[in-house]
């Protein structure tokens, strides 16, 4: 649970960093602010700048959103301008027209897909990706936690949509998945309740026993366990997978190590 909730503006209340978008031809787009933020809400980049200032790191963020977008416009080419994007919201990227059947251009110095990164090397990391064994090894008593999006949901953004909430309930989409072999080790049958616990926390979930998951893993969807009563359709449905995930990141990329978590499983009532 968060110690602080910061008043981030909605997507209609803040302009965005420009970015490429998929289309019949390559374009760059920028979302322009439609209305002023409500109350004390601020854009994310303003919140980050304010936090940096409070931490004595304001000099590291001594620029505005337009400065970032202007630099990106220069990188895309002379025909992409900030004024133009403020006016139209999108524009084509010169030299990036691609039609079906054409050989795509790779935007690297060599024109090829690189398998080594000089930027990683500058950061003191291996220039070429190196395999590393997982930090945890699942066994018959502690499978590995995995999670991943369900096709009809988008994170928790859509969990409160009435039709999707009803569909998720009808499908019992909130269930944790176990392979029959793994479930048998714990004396668990399809539909049983089980307690899942890690070094970080524990949750109580209904189990789906299915061959669609590896015996070494237990799956929990990331969309449920919403606690906010304001999300009336989603509140109280399923469990929050992040209650089981410790705070850890991969050294090279900073990605969260979500799948490096062994899980203890106990059938409720056993």
What residue ranges belong to the model's regions?
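Flexible glycine/proline-rich, aromatic-decorated loop/lid segments
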Residues: 1-30
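Long, contiguous, secondary-structure-rich segments that constitute the structural scaffold
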Residues: 33-88, 161-176, 181-270
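Structural motif
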Residues: 4, 142-144, 175, 217-218
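Short strand-coil-strand connectors
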Residues: 26, 109, 197-201
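Pocket-edge structural micro-motifs
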Residues: 8, 32, 108-110, 116-117, ...
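Short, well-ordered loop/turn elements at secondary-structure boundaries
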Residues: 1-2, 101-102, 109, 138-141, ...
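Long, low-complexity segments enriched in small/aliphatic residues
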Residues: 67-166
């Amino acid at each position: 649970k968060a110690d602080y909730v910061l008043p981030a503006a909605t997507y209609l209340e803040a302009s965005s960093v420009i970015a490429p978008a998929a289309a019949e031809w390559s374009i760059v787009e920028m979302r322009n602010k439609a209305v002023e933020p409500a109350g004390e809400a601020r854009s994310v980049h303003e919140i980050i700048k304010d936090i940096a200032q409070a931490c004595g790191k304001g000099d590291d963020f001594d620029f505005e959103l337009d400065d970032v977008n202007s630099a990106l416009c220069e990188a895309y080419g002379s025909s992409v301008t900030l004024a133009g994007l403020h006016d139209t919201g999108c524009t084509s990227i010169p030299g990036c027209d691609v039609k079906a059947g054409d050989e795509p251009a790779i935007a690297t110095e060599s024109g090829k897909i690189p398998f080594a990164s000089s930027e990683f090397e500058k950061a003191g990391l291996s220039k070429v990706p190196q395999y590393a064994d997982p930090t945890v090894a699942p066994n018959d008593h502690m499978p590995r936690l995995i999670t991943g999006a369900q096709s009809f949901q988008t994170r928790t953004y859509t969990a409160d949509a009435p039709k999707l909430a009803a569909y998720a309930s009808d499908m019992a989409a909130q269930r944790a998945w176990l392979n029959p072999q793994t479930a048998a080790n714990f004396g668990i049958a399809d539909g049983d309740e089980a307690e899942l616990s890690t070094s970080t926390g524990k949750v109580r979930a209904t189990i789906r026993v299915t061959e669609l998951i590896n015996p070494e893993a237990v799956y929990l969807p990331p969309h449920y366990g919403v606690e906010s009563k304001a999300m009336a359709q989603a509140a109280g449905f399923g469990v929050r997978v992040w209650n089981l995930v410790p705070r850890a990141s991969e050294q090279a990329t900073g990605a969260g190590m979500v799948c490096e978590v062994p899980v203890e499983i106990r059938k409720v009532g056993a």
